[in-house]
Amino acid sequence: GLRIGALTTHRSIEKSPLIYEKYKVLSEMEKSVASVQTRNWGTIGGNLCSADPIGDPAPSLIALNAKLKIVSSRGERTIPLEKFFKDYFTTVLKPDEILTEIQLPPPVAHTGVVYMKFSTIEAGIKIVSTSVLITIDPGKMTCKNARIVMSAVAPVPFNAKKGGKLLIGNKIDDQLIE
């Protein structure tokens, strides 16, 4: 797997050879985060903790099944990123807690992940974004796992679980996608 510190800048993630090799979707997604200037100083942890429903990283990280390490003076806990957001600009963080780390499981063989952002201008505020993860069963050439996660469509990132379930067990082709 991979652990990304909460203070890691967007630009560091975008330019990391290790992340590009193992989690290419994150490098590609980071290119769409605001401007280069913002990516140079903005952090992944700050982005997630702001809980902005139009945030770029959350859909891809949720599709990848990311977990968050949260620390306080009482100890630490790890939660799925999907359970981190409560409402517009609201998280499950308690007043004495901080996010310290994003944890990603090891990449799964025969899996592809893509991130797409639709906005009115390049590097502009998006209308909607989505990240799709699909794992293929190479023996049957059918979908074994699918996750479709969107932002800017609800107060928190939306995991379209029913959409993912529709793909499982089916051969992925143009007809199914339509």
Residue ranges and their predicted role:
Residues 1-178:
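C-terminal structural segment of proteins
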